[in-house]
Amino acid sequence: MKSVVVQYKTKSDRGDDNQRIVEKVFEELSEHDPGGLRYATLRLADGVSFAHIAVVKTADGSNPIGQISAFAEFQREIGDRCADPPAAEDATVIGSYRFFSD
């Protein structure tokens, strides 16, 4: 199992755009479950900060979100939407209450 947290800030006028694009990723995930992935995105109260949390459980450790075309679209112009670029860090789940399991 591999866990990753990605954080970034959008430009002040791009938070809503970013949210719409992220919502499309979740729509496609619901339609075409790639398996081996638990994924969440949070928008912080300031309206421009976002955090993505991914837990990958695949045999080879590859992240199946790369199979999602809406995610490719999300990544395509992320630099244009961001004031602070995305920073990804590996993470360790030390506890979870119904967050990563049904």
What residues fall within each predicted segment?
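Short, well-ordered beta-strand segments in beta-rich or mixed alpha/beta enzyme
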Residues: 2-9, 37-69
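Short, surface-exposed ligand-recognition loops at beta-strand->loop->(often short) alpha-helix junctions
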Residues: 9-20
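Residue-level signal for secondary-structure boundary sites
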Residues: 14-16, 60-62, 96
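An amphipathic, aromatic/His-enriched active-site/gating alpha helix that lines ligand/cofactor pockets
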Residues: 24, 28-37, 55-89
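Hydrophobic/anchoring residues in structured secondary elements
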Residues: 41, 90-93
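Short, low-order "capping/linker" segments at domain edges
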Residues: 92-102
